[in-house]
Amino acid sequence: MTLEEGLPSADLIVLATPVDTIPLLTVKILNRIAPHQVVMDTGSIKGELCEVVAMHARRGRFVATHPMWGTEYSGPDAASRGAFAGRTAVICERERSDRDAVETVERLYGALGMPLVSMEPEEHDLHTAYVSHISHVTSFALALTVLEKEREEQHIF
């Protein structure tokens, strides 16, 4: 089924594609939806996306979200039952979305057992960057510490 074939029968359209595809895909879908339809995304970057849709005539039908759950794995094999329960979902620019659209998304996340928080896109992106990169920063700092200690001891691997 193509996007054009499936879109008319959907009440809620969930975008869960690679983050670099979401802004243009969101615009493409907003251009085609009916007034009752809701579009939401699940991408990890919100700043660019929210800028791209800011002036769209159907901006109110879009809810920018990010379920804060994931592993190093992706695809269907990475799925696990109950994975979202107790994990936070972020809604960005809640006030720019129509009330009924936000309520639809809240019901979905509520059914998954996910508490909700609201953030501005820039705040979300900053916090997500911290969380996503903390393991890399920690590993790098540890490696530098070990190398410095080895230099002090004049033993370098």
Residue ranges with predicted function:
Residues 20-21, 46, 69, 97:
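Glycine-rich nucleotide phosphate-binding loop and flanking beta-alpha elements
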Residues 27-77:
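Rossmann-like NAD(P)(H) cofactor-binding subdomain of soluble oxidoreductases
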Residues 8, 57-60, 82-85:
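Structured loop/turn residues at beta-strand edges in well-structured enzyme cores
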Residues 1, 63, 117-120:
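General small-molecule cofactor/ligand-binding pocket signal
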Residues 71-89:
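Predominantly a Rossmann-like dinucleotide-binding segment in NAD(P)-dependent oxidoreductases
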Residues 3-33, 37-38:
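Rossmann-like NAD(P)-binding element
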Residues 16-18, 43, 93:
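Glycine-rich, N-terminal phosphate-binding loop of Rossmann-like dinucleotide-binding domains
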Residues 83-157:
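Internal alpha-helical scaffold of NAD(P)-dependent oxidoreductase catalytic cores
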